[in-house]
């Protein structure tokens, strides 16, 4: 049965083009189309849709205001945000993801550009993921905020529950759909004294990862930044891969630095976590702590398998219940690569216990 889609856009031309694209795919059916957030709210209050395609800038009630109203009234909806490719657009998109949107796509400025095959393919594949995802994680997020230990108490926890942490370690995290919100329940809980650098590949297009890293940095005690070419890795710092490039780690005279490559997308994504994991094969870290979080597809599995063949790894996968999309962790688990499977609210603790903190 075709998935029922609600389209919310104030532009009659753009609305028609988006609806035509959706209806061209037998997996979907445009059930309703409206011009602003208020009309959408009225429909969502009484109808169920498999996904909502939501514009940002609209009269009467814009996209963010609709998400706020849905959250306030505890109305669940699986929202795909149509964003603009600007610095301000990136900020608004991150706000939307915090408010419960599951994913976003850059909407071209003109309706003509929307008809290009590359956009249509990307839009329909993203819509399929959203339509088959769980609704926004309001309850999970609130539970994490209420029950999570602070970064300071995490240090005490690690010291009171020491594991045999020896040698140098590095943490490498992969996440996709649902990741931006889930990562806000993980990274801010890691202590600044974490005794390892952290690499992070979140599937995002160019122009969004810088704002995403800044937002995580504002919430965290340890430093979070978009990784720059040639930058040397430091313990207690999270390096977020740039969008649209593959992040690798190079060993130069005993120093580990960030290196980007512009190879084609792999697993349908760019950046791809497989490149990150495989770049650590020839490193001298005594152990690589691999963390695979919510997301569609199998990114991370091949890279971790290749890494495990050459190095000691410890693989942590997010559990099914707390994932928005149980794809990437499921593939790692089914491949027999996972050492621990834990819910979202235990990931930070598991990472900290695995690598330790500086004395």
What are these regions (language model features)?
Residues 2-6, 12-27, 33, 38-39, ...:
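Conserved acid/base catalytic micro-environments in cytosolic active-site loops
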